[in-house]
């Protein structure tokens, strides 16, 4: 079985480095599936999840707040603004951040404050979705 090296990095740290048989992420135009020997490409990533399928069939879920995906024939790199492994998500903190962002949006503060709240809300939703998917996987 052929593999492709996958690197997922954020501004703070390297989140994942390893071999994969498939990497799935959400680009600006929709969902992308990157397999070994994929044609080179660069695209923006929307906030969402990145799913890495390892050679043993395990699926690893990551939540990202957006970024860039670079694909070369032997390596796929996710350069995320922020990224976190699904199992590392602190649900209570994420829910609190989501509620705070919703409060700011409801009060319609300054334009910059609203833009930041929208970004934080998008990140919180993505993290909660990744956490829910992880829980469903663990139940099976």
From Swiss-Prot:
Q: Which taxonomic lineage does the organism of this UniProt entry have? A: Bacteria, Pseudomonadati, Pseudomonadota, Gammaproteobacteria, Lysobacterales
Q: Which GO terms describe its cellular component?
A: plasma membrane; proton-transporting ATP synthase complex
One MF annotation (Gene Ontology) recorded for this entry: ATP binding
Q: Report what the protein is called.
A: ATP synthase epsilon chain
- According to its UniProt entry, what is the function of this protein? Produces ATP from ADP in the presence of a proton gradient across the membrane.
Q: Which PANTHER family match?
A: ATP SYNTHASE DELTA/EPSILON CHAIN (PTHR13822), ATP SYNTHASE EPSILON CHAIN, CHLOROPLASTIC (PTHR13822:SF10)
Which gene is annotated as encoding this protein in its UniProt record?
Answer: atpC
Say which family it is in.
Belongs to the ATPase epsilon chain family.
Oligomer and partners: F-type ATPases have 2 components, CF(1) - the catalytic core - and CF(0) - the membrane proton channel. CF(1) has five subunits: alpha(3), beta(3), gamma(1), delta(1), epsilon(1). CF(0) has three main subunits: a, b and c.
Q: Where in the cell is it found?
A: Cell membrane
Identify its membrane topology class: Peripheral membrane protein
Mind listing the UniProt keywords for this protein, alphabetically?
A: ATP synthesis, Cell membrane, CF(1), Hydrogen ion transport, Ion transport, Membrane, Transport
């Amino acid at each position: 079985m052929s593999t492709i090296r996958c690197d997922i990095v954020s501004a703070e740290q390297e989140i994942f480095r390893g071999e994969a048989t498939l990497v799935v992420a959400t680009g600006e135009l929709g969902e992308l599936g990157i397999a070994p020997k994929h044609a080179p490409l660069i695209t923006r990533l929307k906030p969402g999840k990145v799913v890495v399928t390892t050679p043993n069939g395990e699926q690893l879920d990551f939540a990202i707040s957006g970024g860039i995906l670079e694909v070369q024939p032997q390596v796929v790199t996710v350069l995320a603004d922020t990224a976190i492994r699904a199992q590392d998500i602190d649900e209570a903190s994420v829910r609190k951040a989501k509620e705070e962002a919703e409060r700011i949006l409801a009060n319609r503060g300054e334009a910059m404050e609203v833009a930041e709240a929208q970004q934080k809300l998008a990140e919180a939703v993505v993290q909660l979705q990744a956490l829910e998917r992880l829980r469903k996987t663990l139940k099976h």
